[in-house]
Amino acid sequence: MREISVPAPFTVGEHDNVAAMVFEHERDDPDYVIYQRLIDGVWTDVTCAEAANQIRAAALGLISLGVQAGDRVVIFSATRYEWAILDFAILAVGAVTVPIYETSSAEQVRWVLQDSEAVVLFAETDSHATMVAELSGSVPALREVLQIAGSGPNALDRLTEAGASVDPAELTARLAALRSTDPATLIYTSGTTGRPKGCQLTQSNLVHEIKGARAYHPTLLRKGERLLVFLPLAHVLARAISMAAFHSKVTVGFTSDIKNLLPMLAVFKPTVVVSVPRVFEKVYNTAEQNAANAGKGRIFAIAAQTAVDWSEACDRGGPGLLLRAKHAVFDRLVYRKLRAALGGNCRAAVSGGAPLGARLGHFYRGAGLTIYEGYGLSETSGGVAISQFNDLKIGTVGKPVPGNSLRIADDGELLVRGGVVFSGYWRNEQATTEAFTDGWFKTGDLGAVDEDGFLTITGRKKEIIVTAGGKNVAPAVLEDQLRAHPLISQAVVVGDAKPFIGALITIDPEAFEGWKQRNSKTAGASVGDLATDPDLIAEIDAAVKQANLAVSHAESIRKFRILPVDFTEDTGELTPTMKVKRKVVAEKFASDIEAIYNKE
């Protein structure tokens, strides 16, 4: 199958917009708890009426600052409650939200401010505010900087005070003037291959995304469910899911404190979470390592295989009597503990940003947590394809979100069009023209659609490795397999214009400690100290051999190199959503790559 379309069971009207739902909820269900926010470490209820009042006050404050419809307003902050309130306020006055990751460098912030010509910026912390102040001479359009937290006056309080003298009728008029074709947000791409481009999304794009998600997931996105958002709201996935949840009256909480995520999950008790595959891989690998450290590695291995078998059997008419009995035993011994780590009530998750892997998907479903994989980009308002609760094929990213179409080009590239697809790049006609072909957006990803209409992503077009022998290799297949090993943190497949495929491997710091203990290694030894240790080499070699089973002999990894350090966002090898920056890795570890191909 080369093309598939899914019609929308809804319409988007001329004046439909994202902010309208804030005041609809206030009118229809004022006392319902739509948010919970952390105040002094306690999750505190926020009703629809309270949220609407805060958003209204912030919007009036923006009007008092002279923010006009179409003006760009930056949120430079980690994920937190105020992020969502400010976003809705910006949209309500007809302005355009411009997110910046809280980890961005001064040069990245400068470029976004200069290119977008933002007039107001919300800085989260003292350090964010200081960075922006130091850039003030090079960003003349920026008139106002307000601080969300830290030592400065609170941004929401300042807006409330400033907007007290503004007639509420002015906000009513702004809302009435909004059209679905109006710009809503400007999201800057990661810029791994040059200057970041501003991706323009309209109110219509976001409304299509929100309504499409609800159409596919009426049992996840419904009143009474609970969602804890911990991915960066600057990333389109977290923001789109948060908006869809708000629309469906899911109670939403926010945190950026990843180090204390498990205790927060235990208290918040979400029924659904949204994350990237690396988090699900990490949870699995940690559970496997903890079992191994406790001398129960064999039990966990059998439990994991039973979960996979049970899930696969569900796709073939259901598990038999013996498998059901085994599954029940391991549910008490293993799976229940895994669910408890996520708060005890979590029954489903949404995964996006990278492929999850079929085995991991089956494991989690078998353990009682169904993961619905999706696919999308900033240019598609988040998900353009997603697995459905009643139409799931693990290992795929599902079917098009209603109102959208997918096509596989002759060279295997995935093309998309429809309600969620963006209108173009900000002030960059050349890039916009290059991004489309006959009205279809060129995603840059390689994919396939099976006979049932399910989409599978096989890699990035620009990441395809062409060996010296002319063999095309998609690195993601091997890398996903390698990251499934509990001792491996990251893997980068190399071999462009080389005689064979190689790999750079980093070791998971937490798993490494347990491995040293089980293998009688010196407690204080670092990965660098043991990078050539025969036992460590043997363990990674076994993982490489297992990964190679997923590809042909010509595509298989012949040699690998263990790096002395792991990749992190702080050291520059990872994006805020934990994707590897291949160009950075290739430059930083050029000598290690060369060593793979040096003749011994």
UniProtKB/Swiss-Prot annotation:
Signal peptide: none annotated. PROSITE patterns: AMP_BINDING. One of its GO terms (cellular component) is membrane. SUPFAM superfamilies: Acetyl-CoA synthetase-like. InterPro entries: AMP-bd_C_sf, AMP-binding_CS, AMP-dep_synth/lig_dom, ANL_N_sf. Pathway: Lipid metabolism; fatty acid biosynthesis. It is an enzyme of class 6 (ligase). One of its GO terms (molecular function) is ATP binding. It catalyses: a long-chain fatty acid + ATP + CoA = a long-chain fatty acyl-CoA + AMP + diphosphate. Gene3D superfamilies: 3.30.300.30, N-terminal domain of ligase-like (3.40.50.12780). Keywords: ATP-binding, Fatty acid metabolism, Ligase, Lipid metabolism, Nucleotide-binding. The keyword Ligase applies. The keyword Nucleotide-binding applies. Its EC number is 6.2.1.3. Catalyzes the activation of long-chain fatty acids as acyl-coenzyme A (acyl-CoA), which are then transferred to the multifunctional polyketide synthase (PKS) type III for further chain extension. PANTHER family: AMP-DEPENDENT SYNTHETASE_LIGASE DOMAIN-CONTAINING PROTEIN (PTHR43272:SF32), LONG-CHAIN-FATTY-ACID--COA LIGASE (PTHR43272). This is Long-chain-fatty-acid--CoA ligase FadD15. The lineage of its organism: Bacteria, Bacillati, Actinomycetota, Actinomycetes, Mycobacteriales.
